[in-house]
Design a protein with these regions (language model features):
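N-terminal, active-site-proximal structural segment of metallo-dependent hydrolase catalytic domains
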Residues: 8-112
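Structured beta-strand-rich core segments of catalytic domains in phosphoester-bond hydrolases
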Residues: 79-161
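Sec-dependent N-terminal signal peptides
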Residues: 1-9
Length: 162
């Protein structure tokens, strides 16, 4: 009976991280707004506090009765780079969840990307790629759409566009 319940239960979460940038300058992007010397004073303390809050938000989505079960899959929008995703999955409260992730490398001038974080126990990634969004003439480039497909624990294939 328990195994049937586990097979039919899959938690999917989407979270806008609202500019999750690290504190290091990327010379290929316009990320100057999120540096310790900027008007925002984006310090390591503020960065790690944001990582902590996001990880708590994700964990709260998996709470079931008095137990905490991490969501099986989380789409994260407005993340800067692989370094930020590494910190979130390996150096935050989520480190014990064992999440894997894939992400885009979009042409957005500030470096804003989309990531898909997933539990390898609930989702086996088969394929992922970015779908480029061509902006209308006169508009600046935007983030790509992330497409991922994989097999869920029931054996079905799940297609995700984020």
């Amino acid at each position: 009976m328990i195994s049937l319940l586990l097979i039919s239960f899959f938690t999917f979460v989407e979270l806008n991280c609202e500019n999750l940038f690290d504190t290091r300058h990327d010379s290929l992007k316009h990320d100057e707004e999120f540096l310790p010397t900027s008007a925002l004073r984006w310090t390591p303390y503020r960065y790690w506090r944001k990582i902590d809050r996001i990880s708590k938000d994700i964990l709260s989505c998996g709470e079931l009765d008095s137990a905490t079960v991490v969501p099986d899959m989380v789409v994260l929008t407005e993340v800067e780079n692989d370094s930020v995703m590494h910190d979130l999955t390996r150096r935050s409260l989520l480190r014990g969840a064992g999440y894997d992730y894939v992400m885009t490398s979009s042409p957005d001038l500030r470096g804003i990307d989309v990531a898909l974080m997933f539990s390898p126990y609930a989702f086996r990634l088969i394929h992922s790629h970015a779908i480029r969004v061509t902006p209308p003439a006169g508009f600046r480039p935007t983030r790509d759409i992330l497409y991922a497909s994989g097999e869920v624990i029931s054996g079905d294939t799940l297609h995700v566009f984020a």
